[in-house]
Amino acid sequence: LKDYIKKKGRLSAKETISISIQMVTGLQAAHNHHIIHRDIKPQNIIISKDGKVKVTDFGIARATTSTQTISTSVMGSVHYTSPEQARGGVVDEKSDIYSAGISMYEMVTGHVPFDGESTVTVAIKHLQEEIISPIVEVPDTPKSLEKIILKCTQKSPMYRYQNCEELLLDLKRALVDPQGGFISNGPKVNNVDETVVMDTQEIARVQNRDYDGEDYDDPDESYDDEEYDDDSYDRRNRREDG
C-alpha cells in the first residue's frame, strides 16, 4: 500500500474507503482472537494483483485475554503510533484503530499527518498536536470520510471507535452516503492550534521509548510475513502448544 500511495500521489475517497474496509476486516479477525497488531501502517498492508488487501507482519503483535490489555515497551512505527503507545501506556484494539486512521489519512492526502527530525519529535506530536482535517489539504474529501478519520485518531481511546465492527459500519455507509452526517460526534475536536501541555516526566518517558525508525521500507519485504486469517491463527496455536 505504501508504494501504491507513492505511485498515485494520493487515493480517491472511494478507493480509500474500499481499501480501508478490507484492512479493518483483517484487523477485526485478529481482534476477535484477542490479537493486537500494534504496527498497522501502509507498509504492512499488501494489495494483491486482484485487488485483495491483506494485513501482514504480526511481528510485534501480542495476544490478550478477552478482558486483558497490553502495557509494554515494544513500539511500532512512530509515524502511525497511538498516543498511548508513545507514552508506554495500555494498548488494546483502539490503538490499532488509531493507526488505521493515520493510514487512511495518508491514503487521502498522500502523506502522514505528523513528521519531524526525530522519532521523539513525531511521538510528541501524536501526544500534543491535533490532526489537521484532511479537508484542509484535500477540499473534496467527503464529509463522512473526514469524520471517520478524525474519530479514529482522537487522542483519548474512549472517544475513538471502540471496535472494528463500529468502524466497518461507518465505512460501508460512507460508500453509499459520502456526505452523510451519520457518524456519532464523540468529544469536540480541539482547535488545530491548541496544544496539550506535557510535564517533564512524560516527555522523558517518550524520549526513552523504543521506536521503529524504519517507516518507509519497501513493502515487498513484508510479502513473506505471516498474513492474518483464522487458519493461520489456528496453525500458530498448534505450533505453540507443541
Question: What do these predicted ranges mean?
Answer:
Residues 23-35:
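Protein kinase catalytic-loop region centered on the HRD/HxD motif
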Residues 19-20:
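Activation segment signature within eukaryotic-like protein kinase domains
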Residues 109-113, 156:
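Structural helix C-cap motif within protein kinase domains
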Residues 160:
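Conserved HRD-motif arginine in the catalytic loop of eukaryotic-like protein kinases
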Residues 96:
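Conserved catalytic-loop aspartate of Hanks-type protein kinases
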